[in-house]
């Protein structure tokens, strides 16, 4: 597409001669390569030079914003996100129930030791089956999903999963990973692109596709980690973690078989998630899930 904006005839009609034009292109190509290498080095140093230990997940993460910045981002985005899904649900009792269960999960789990002021919202959208978390602790569930849940434990499972995204700092990780992949993709595009060589356009396109697929992979890994954290958190709060399996069945039914192939999705398919949840339950409760947990 760039070549269409700068017709090659313009470069061949200035009296420089063929050899001069080739030398000029080689010189420009060398400069582009050096700049591209510098861009790639900066992206790599910025990413791998920012390492933070997460005491709740027990892993080091590459993150370049603070928890306070996450909270500010979430608070800034919350009103607009709520508006996109019809605003807050008019039923105050239903909103209070969501908030109560969410706060119980936070208060009775490892999430209580995080830096985030959690707040739980029920949105009015009756069509979109969804729940999501913004950076810093703003958590939302739509009426379309809320109305499909059959037990309190299933609602706890949805909210616990979203709490997992927050304490897992997945949004902050994603920001850093996007900056890395964009920096590396930009470096490849800059260093390989040549308006006179159509194959360089294909190289640039391939680099961008690879960057997108890498970010999708990160998204799937985040979902699986949040499932594991959800099992842990709702169990700590007194709910039966097997309720999360029921949530997966509900989501699968709501998708009506219209999901994309797993490789091209930011969410793993339901079978994969159910297997991961069962594995997490076995790890959390090697002697079996105890009696008396809320279903």
Predicted regions and their residues:
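A Zn2+-metalloprotease active-site environment signal
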Residues: 2-295
């Amino acid at each position: 597409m760039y070549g269409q904006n700068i017709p090659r005839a313009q470069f061949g009609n200035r009296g420089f001669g063929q050899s001069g034009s080739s030398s000029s292109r080689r010189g420009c190509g060398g400069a582009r390569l050096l700049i591209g290498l510098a861009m790639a080095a900066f992206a790599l140093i910025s990413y791998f030079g920012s390492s933070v230990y997460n005491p709740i997940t027990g892993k080091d993460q590459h993150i370049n914003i603070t928890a306070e910045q996450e909270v500010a981002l979430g608070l800034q985005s919350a009103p607009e996100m709520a508006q996109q899904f019809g605003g807050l649900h008019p039923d105050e009792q239903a909103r209070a129930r969501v908030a109560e269960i969410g706060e119980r999960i936070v208060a009775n789990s490892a999430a209580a030791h995080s830096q985030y002021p959690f707040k739980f919202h029920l949105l009015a959208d009756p069509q979109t089956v969804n729940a999501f978390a913004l950076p810093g602790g703003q958590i939302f569930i739509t009426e379309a999903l809320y109305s499909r849940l059959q037990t309190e434990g299933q609602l706890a499972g949805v909210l616990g999963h979203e709490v997992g995204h927050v304490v897992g700092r997945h949004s902050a990780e994603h920001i850093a990973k996007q900056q890395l992949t964009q920096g590396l993709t930009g470096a490849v595009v800059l260093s390989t692109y040549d308006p006179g060589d159509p194959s360089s356009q294909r190289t640039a396109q391939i680099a961008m596709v690879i960057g997108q697929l890498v970010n999708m992979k990160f998204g799937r890994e985040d979902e699986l980690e949040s499932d594991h954290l959800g099992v842990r958190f709702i169990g700590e709060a007194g709910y039966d973690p097997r309720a999360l399996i029921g949530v997966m069945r509900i989501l699968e039914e709501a998708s009506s078989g219209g999901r994309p192939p797993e490789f091209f999705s930011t969410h793993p398919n339901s079978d994969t998630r159910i297997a991961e949840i069962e594995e997490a339950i076995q790890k959390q409760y090697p002697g079996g899930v105890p009696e008396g947990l809320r279903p």
